[in-house]
UniProtKB/Swiss-Prot annotation:
Organism: Alkaliphilus metalliredigens (strain QYMF)
Catalytic activity: (1S,2R)-1-C-(indol-3-yl)glycerol 3-phosphate + L-serine = D-glyceraldehyde 3-phosphate + L-tryptophan + H2O
Function: The alpha subunit is responsible for the aldol cleavage of indoleglycerol phosphate to indole and glyceraldehyde 3-phosphate.
Protein name: Tryptophan synthase alpha chain
Gene Ontology cellular-component terms listed: cytosol
Known pathway: Amino-acid biosynthesis; L-tryptophan biosynthesis; L-tryptophan from chorismate: step 5/5
Amino acid sequence: MISRITNKLQALKEYDEKALITYVTAGDPDLETTFDLVLAMEKAGADIIELGIPYSDPLADGPVIQRASQRALNAGANMEAIFELVIKLREKTQIPLVFLVYYNCVFKYGLETFLNRCQEIGIDGLIIPDLPLEERRELQVMMQQYPMDLIPLVAPTSEDRMKEIVQDAEGFIYCVSSTGVTGKRNSLAGNLEGFMQQLRTYTEIPLVIGFGISNSEMMDKLKNICDGFIIGSAVIEKIEAGLEDRSSVERVSKFIEKLYEFKNLG
């Protein structure tokens, strides 16, 4: 089954456009604002939206997204409430939606129950940053019966390991631009171009760069070596900046509009 993610990325490729993928933590600062943020980001030009399921111990996340997770948990965000949020969103939009979720959350919910629920509500893909390679293979087999993509994260590592991770990948490959946790950076890994070229020899799946992408200058430097960009911590910072005067949605919308304009000019 071809997912909405694949359809969207194929359509962008036909027009020689890069994918603009944005991330928000579901429930930060509350579920109502997340609802508004998703619709505003789509209107501003986002092609795919990642919804992070808040978790108390997010190992791959830097301080910005950790704070977002804590705000969401404090506001009462939980799995069922987030599922309800997606149901409401699906009444308004068909934009591809991806859950970024830690494996422990999925395991506690029950793997098959979680997948069934995701399919019912219209989730198009899963990113599980702490999923071991061995469990990944089992999950890939299970997910063949669902119209959802299991999206791998790949960082510069051994050739054999990279080949194994991208084998049978679907949707897109989440290419980690720098070591460490998520967050804005002033510079990215030195040999990012070599890493991307190497990955391209292993797979034809779209390569999307994340971890540290925060502005159009970075996008400009990377546009020739990837098929899209994931903007996460920079979006959360706009949300944070607008908490006091409730301008988060407006700030995020303007930020995404600028990136979208640049993406199309570039």
